Amino acid sequence: MEEALEMARAKDTKERMAAVERLHQLLEASRKSLSPAEVTSLVDSCLDLLKDSNFRVSQGALQALASAAVLAGEHLKLHLNALVPAVVERLGDSKQPVRDAARRLLTTLMEVSSPTIIVERAGSYAWMHKSWRVREEFARTVTSAIGLFASTELPLQRVILAPILQMLNDPNQAVREAAILCIEEMYMQGGSQFREELQRHHLPSYMVKDINARLERIEPQLRSTDGRSAHHVVNEVKASSVNPKKSSPRAKAPTRENSLFGGDADITEKPIEPIKVYSEKELIREFEKIAATLVPEKDWSMRISAMRRVEGLVAGGATDYSCFRGLLKQLVGPLSTQLADRRSTIVKQACHLLCLLSKELLGDFEACAETFIPVLFKLVVITVLVIAESADNCIKTMLRNCKAARVLPRIAESAKHDRNAILRARCCEYALLTLEHWPDAPEIQRSVDLYEDLIRCCVADAMSEVRATARMCYRMFAKTWPDRSRRLFSSFDPVIQRLINEEDGGIHRRHASPSVRERHSQPSFSQTSAPSNLPGYGTSAIVAMDRSSNLSSGGSLSSGLLLSQSKDVNKGSERSLESVLQSSKQKVSAIESMLRGLHISDRQNPAALRSSSLDLGVDPPSSRDPPFHAVAPASNSHTSSAAAESTHSINKGSNRNGGLGLSDIITQIQASKDSGRSSYRGNLLSESHPTFSSLTAKRGSERNERSSLEESNDAREVRRFMAGHFDRQQMDTAYRDLTFRESNASHVPNFQRPLLRKNVGGRMSAGRRRSFDDSQLQIGDISNFVDGPASLNEALNDGLNSSSDWCARVAAFNFLQTLLQQGPKGAQEVIQSFEKVMKLFLRHLDDPHHKVAQAALSTLADLIPSCRKPFESYMERVLPHVFSRLIDPKEVVRQPCSSTLEIVSKTYSVDSLLPALLRSLDEQRSPKAKLAVIEFAINSFNRYAGNPEISGNSGILKLWLAKLTPLTRDKNTKLKEASITCIISVYNHYDSAGLLNYILSLSVEEQNSLRRALKQYTPRIEVDLLNYMQSKKEKQRIKSYDPSDAIGTSSEEGYAGASKKNIFLGRYSGGSIDSDSGRKWSSSQEPTMITGGVGQNVSSGTQEKLYQNVRTGISSASDLLNPKDSDYTFASAGQNSISRTSPNGSSENIEILDDLSPPHLEKNGLNLTSVDSLEGRHENEVSRELDLGHYMLTSIKVNTTPESGPSIPQILHMINGSDGSPSSSKKSGLQQLIEASVANEESVWTKYFNQILTVVLEVLDDEDFSIKELALSLISEMLKSQKDAMEDSVEIVIEKLLHVSKDTVPKVSTEAEQCLTTVLSQYDPFRCLSVIVPLLVTEDEKTLVACINCLTKLVGRLSQEELMDQLSSFLPAVFEAFGSQSADVRKTVVFCLVDIYIMLGKAFLPYLEGLNSTQVRLVTIYANRISQARNGAPIDADT
């Protein structure tokens, strides 16, 4: 590339043309990322070439930049300010190829950066450009951008709309036409919402008329919805009934939803048009074309179209061809190439396609998944968030839908030993996901050793997220292999054992799965206590018969379904319901006795079931054949009452036998819900519980016309029926008979519901079902509703069972909701099992099936008002899951989510919500989700009814503000605006003083940045902040300042300032000295005893109480006195008095102590007095000043001895600068303290050490580097002269010095490093380690390098035994730092490990197993060299 850039500088035009062509070829062929230096060199050269007189050179430079943008990544963003204007100028070039290349480059920049940002930057030059051609081409560019990015970049249209509307008035016709085309594209993407947006701009009527005329001619591309129109589906069903041959793949219509992620992804895709193929040859040709397109040489938009074409083929029914799976293997290579592409759009589309294929093919996709997952590992760790999230979601979706057991060793190896912490964390999640979804698979059962090694290694990982996931994996391991888990647990470190035991009682962010199976329980089943997960048993009549027999030998009955009579085809014999029941009574007892003998684990064993059911003449469902067939749902237009009527006949029998009928549940829901919500619930129920009572018999002749082909293809036909409404009166009888026979075969033997669900959920072949397809409801699922749980405990067990299907989970939530609607009695039952109830919510709020999530959120909305108090303790763990569903692609999930949050907002105050909001904001990765959390917080703060002047929950509030502050600088405009609005809302409604104190506690840079951001929205906070700072200074001036009783507060409230709630006298009580460290410490200095000379009129009790109150910092003067001591006088030298003060604090007469002052009276802005006539030395006296009707206690400084210079308190006051003292005063004060440190008078340093250290550490944040340099000189001197006193505060000194060592001024940073060296070499090494070790996990490179350097120095001071004891505390973090991308960090780690190696010798080698071979070799080589240089012999020779 360097040669090509050199050629591009040639004078000859042909050479330049050849150079740009060569450059373009090199960049297109390259797969290696460009370095920052290469990007800079390339951009600089191309910017010159863009202005070249030859248009082909300009065109080539633009093409080269477009190729480089994909390889440059983040490095290109530094050059956008120079690059974008130059590209905009090329939009006005006289040659069309140059203009096209410029448009393509802008589109590419939008792809690799942010479309909104690029449009804003380019628009500032292009919208009002003097060249009409630039304006026209830019309008066409943004039009194509809307088509590409509108679905993923929501703010884009708003940024474009206003300037595009202005272009409609452009004098040039071509520009106006380009603008109207852009408006048409926005309408196609936005639909009716775009019209509403247009109305806000108040356009002239003639313009509105013209726009509407253009828009009426186009049809907006509507987003995918649940199902299709009723008319279309009815026609389809009728056509299918007339001609059974239509069930071929050619005629198969796609009933699948277009949003195929099922709630897993955060994107909305354009609907895919089904592509039908009519032969295998045609399908083969399609695949060949697609494979030829998916090569790097093809344009990226063509490759995206090819992948979308595969989706269209799948939607058109291509998966039903037997050759599809073989053809798919041809795409493995091309799709892997697309995954390796640098464009996020291509990667995202490829991941989307893989998710779709895995959901379609299920187990048949397993071989492909095992190939793709290792490729996706490389993407999970990439810095581009869109790519990383798409890859992560893709892997998880594939693991949910197919076992991919052969890739499990690779997952485990990466989780244990990969250098990248993110990949280790993700691989731990993948291993846990596999164990959760496939615990019974033989391949997983054989992987027990692999899981054991994985958990043992990962629970000790350096990254907390890996450790937490490994502990969750252990809990799943314990439930899957209980015997092995005990041995594994005993091998853990005691700390890990304690963590696991503590966490077992709670639910975590990802939450552990429930028990897969109870291996040792032996329940006895009886007719009176049979659980409802045995369909039909104890709740409905049981009819056992052979599946193959016809009605003449045995009636067909599904569980819970009672028919008045059934006739066979030949009308030869008729058997009423009564005769059928009578004939089955003899078999009931046999079934009961058989069930009592079954072990619970046998219920999940198909072989055991088969053997037990053979005696009854029943053929149980195999794992290959679907046990149930889907039936069409009731019309969505029916209300819940209609559903109740239609299901009445279903539930009569079950109610008679003691079961809970569906009609009862519906009635209860109707009774407690309003009409609107009842209708909503009814629609849901009618979807979920298809009715049988409306199925009517047809003539026998029609039955005879049905062919066996329709029976064999029944499952496929039924899926098509499920898309919407259907004419139930025209339902054919052959279908009904087949349904009865199949349902009879399914329900009679399947008393064991876990097997039933297992067959439905994951053991069928891919050709017979679709995973997570909500439009395919099967009869087995219906029975799960009809035979719903009979008790809360049973509902919770069903919902928490990891092998349960989505219907069982919905049924569990429906039962819980019904219980809550029964009033206090039902709520009390829920509260008794509240922990288990919350486990159910935490498990399924993130469920990928939208109906489960919808049911969970709706039930949660009912639970919160009923269980307000117990839910509050779970709120912090639940709300993050709720907020994550607020951006779900499906409206049916978002709507109940919004309702739930509204109820939470009304039920709890912001004080209770703040911890949950803090955690929610911390856990959301998507900007949209973060925005939702902040907007919710704004509403909560605005509703706060308290007084904003009174401090709220200050600790949590500071953490919340600390989370918001970085977001005020976020590149996402909406997120930035919401963060600033939230901070303003805190100030206006919640805690104004807390916010002001927080701003003052920030560093100078952060403080200025935040204040600038707030000033743009409201000047009020800035004004109040200045007044607040000024009032604090004035208060400090009025107050006395006593050297022995200096008042100190945290740096947030200013030196020597009074706290809001109390005043501390004589005891330093410092808060956070440094906003980074947050460490609190206080001196042990006590106030000086008030001794004699206080007047005779003060009673001894009052005097004693006065002294006690001074010690404890009581601020109210009236508290100093008992009511009986309200009359008192302080007399001193016969002329000073304080007259009567009433107990409530009001004053009748106040006379300030006023003596004839001697010449040594010190004022300095304070009330000082010296009384020579008093007997004894008076260190303190009390003075009261009237301040706004309240008395404030102040200290009175008594100067008893003459001094030649200023006292220590004066110096501290001068350095602190609270009186506005200039820099020269601060320097003078620091110089005097240095001299005092050298003199080292014990009396001075004993009394004032803490106050001096406080001021010195605070002044290290001064903007003037010379002051910081002087302060560091003082610290250096104190470290030498006041060593004993400094030893007690060494932790906070080290933290502050580490912070200052990063200063940009070399003199300051060098001085700080010298101070650190002194501390580390002379002070207690273990106290130093206690500060350094926790900081080794920091992400800041400079801090990390400094900490590792400190660690290296400390290592040399420890003995071998001490060092061996400490290794476990810091080695994991050091090894983690070894994998850093920074060369400085890696180099520092090497020297640290080398020093340890030299000290410990071969004993250190076992600890190096955490490193890879290259790293170990590097450490040993350096260690031998350094040891040779120091000792004359390498380590290997010594040991």
Curated annotation (Swiss-Prot):
Primary localisation category:
cytoplasm
**Modified sites of kind N-acetylmethionine:** M1
Q: Which GO terms describe its biological process?
A: cell division; cortical microtubule organization; microtubule cytoskeleton organization; mitotic cell cycle; negative regulation of microtubule depolymerization; positive regulation of cell division; protein stabilization; unidimensional cell growth
**Which residues fall in a compositionally biased region of kind Low complexity?**
632-649
Gene Ontology MF term list:
microtubule binding; microtubule plus-end binding
Give the transmembrane ranges: none
Summarize tissue expression: Expressed at a low level in all tissues, mostly in young developing tissues.
**Source taxon at top rank:** Eukaryota
The cysteines joined by S-S bonds are none
Question: Which regions are annotated as HEAT repeats?
Answer: 1-32, 36-74, 77-115, 154-192, 281-319, 325-363, 366-401, 402-439, 486-525, 809-830, 831-869, 872-910, 912-950, 954-992, 994-1031, 1201-1239, 1246-1284, 1287-1325, 1327-1360, 1364-1402, 1405-1439
**Where are the compositionally biased (Basic and acidic residues) regions?**
699-715
Q: Does the keyword Repeat apply?
A: yes
Question: What does the UniProt record say this protein does?
Answer: Cortical microtubule plus-end tracking protein required for cell morphogenesis and cell division. Promotes the stabilization of dynamic microtubules during mitosis. Regulates microtubule-cortex attachment, thereby contributing to self-organization of cortical microtubules and subsequent cell shape.
Q: Which family does it belong to?
A: Belongs to the CLASP family.
PANTHER family per UniProt: CLASP, CLIP-ASSOCIATING PROTEIN
Protein name, per record: CLIP-associated protein
Q: What is the lineage of its organism?
A: Eukaryota, Viridiplantae, Streptophyta, Embryophyta, Tracheophyta
